Amino acid sequence: MKLTVIGATGSMSGPESPASSYLIQARGIDPQSGGERVFSLVCDLGPGSFGALWTHVCPCELDALVLSHCHADHMGDIISLQVYRKWGPGSCALRPVSLFGPEETIRRVRQIEGATDDESYEAEFAFTHMQLGESYAVGPMTIRPFRALHPVEAFGLHIEGPAEDDPSRRVSLFYTGDTDLCDTIIEGARGVDVLLSEVGFTSDETEPDMHMDGLRAGTLATRAAVERMIATHIQPWTPRERVASEIRQAWQGPLEFATSGMEVSL
């Protein structure tokens, strides 16, 4: 399984990166052809991310889009994907791409496009409202949502799949989406190989039940006993040194910062 960071900037696209978007790929057996191929899912598709995604995978080859929640900085570019799937080259032959997300997902897509209430997007998207306690398969990968602590319905995402160097071995990643520190997010992240954690605030910017600062993100990594932490969703005006200093108050393990184009083999 491989993670490619498409966008990592918090709350908006920034001068060095699109907003939140993460490509996760793994090799598996195609149930239709019986042959092996690469399966591709994207977690979130924030502003500016669709064009950057295109440099890593053709939108026609995308197997699934998973939305952690429906704030615009995590899903604004979904309308670009919708336009491609409807009007792009060979679109008439494309099956609807799997779309997993909160209950309000399709309504939010309509709002972004300015579409009428009867627009279903059923030709472009096969939508599933994710349910806590359920799991969802995308090729050899399994997605499990965990309740996040955020002002809207939001999920942290536990994703498991085959290791890059040994497909018989399973590896795991947890993406927090947007959340404050809470027990359900700790549960979802427990023991994962990679924790992709938002750090939307610094300690002097914090509002409750919205984002984590570095201390709380570091606490998450420690309490969940993860192997490796990648900090993301940092505001474009926030110095990474400040974030690292806060994280290190609670986490002494491996720490990296997500950057657009960064690749991580699991």
Positions of PLM-derived features:
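Binuclear metal-dependent hydrolase catalytic cores
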Residues: 1-175, 180, 185-187, 244-266
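Cap/insert and terminal regions of metallo-dependent hydrolase folds
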Residues: 180-264
